[in-house]
Amino acid sequence: MAADLLCMGEPMLEFNQLPPGPDGRSLYLEGHGGDTSNAAIAAARQGARVGFITALGDDPAGASFRALWAREGVDAATVRTDPRHQTGVYFVFHGPDGHSFLHYRANSAAANYAPPDLPEAALAACRILFLSGISQGISDPAADAAFAAIAMVRRAGGLVAYDTNYRPRLWPPARAAAVMTAAIRQADFVFPGEEDARAMLGLADPDAILDHYLGLGPKVVVLKLGAGGAYLGTREGRVRIAAHPVAAVDATGAGDCFCGAFLARILAGDGAESAAAYANAAAALKCTGYGAVAPIPTPEAVRALLARAGRGP
């Protein structure tokens, strides 16, 4: 069965720091991460038909991802195994100022993915392709593959969704802004982050950020504001979506969850405002547990939160 949503990027095995035990030492919860993989799982949990495009190493981490996607209903038929390169790994640390990351991704299997590896038939058949700044920032071949995938989808009449997800350790702001701008000019849905816009564009005002990205051509821009909720912009108008107060312990992957849930609802026929309200609730619930994947909520949990907040349909 063809995937309606194809996500493309870098999966990474995750080790997430837990609160210190009685002896003061921290343990690390093994899990799975990578922004577009997180989004793929979030969309699949909301009922979308999802596939993934990447390369994994021929290693236990790669096997773990294949098992995860099988459990979550994410089609991995378009995932290559690269026997020469390993699957990436990262650590999440928690402190008084929030969470921080340490990545081991240099020369990973995903970073060596190139245009000839692309599954053209699957791309032509999908309704939406989702990718991110990380998808392109990990290497030049990966950036080229992303542009080639976008071209294949657009030629077939599909839509493109893009999350900026700027990581300064991957590339300098000027190059990141140039590459992302070229991709976003071909996108229909764009999900910038407040911190990304400040770092790459020098913009802090939410309306100025929406003005910038809508000016590049996308139909819908959703500015992710973290604890501040979200700000939706279209050619017709703008809507602020209030955050949900939750007992947050780990925001890792919350933005990815937002993107996946939003796209799942778009595929289900929702309008942009309804999809953004749903995704905002899903992202809030994700923050109530540790790890990028395990706390991603079910539709029942999301609708229950919306109902409690008086924001249900």
What is each PLM-predicted segment?
Residues M1-V74, A247-V249, P313:
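Glycine-rich phosphate/adenosyl-contacting loop at the front of the ribokinase-like
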Residues L5-C7, V160, V190-F191, V221:
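Residue-level marker for buried hydrophobic side chains located in beta-strands
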Residues R49-G133, A304-R311:
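Conserved N-terminal subdomain of the carbohydrate kinase-like
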Residues I128, I134-H212, G228-A230:
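Conserved beta-alpha-beta core of the PfkB/ribokinase-like small-molecule kinase fold
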Residues A43, G193, G255:
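Short, conserved phosphate/pyrophosphate- and ester-handling motifs at nucleotide-, phospho-/glycolipid
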Residues F15, L102, L170, M200, ...:
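Residues that scaffold the ATP/ADP-binding catalytic core of kinase and kinase-like folds
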Residues M1-L6, A151-M152, G202-P313:
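Conserved phosphate-binding/catalytic region of the ribokinase-like
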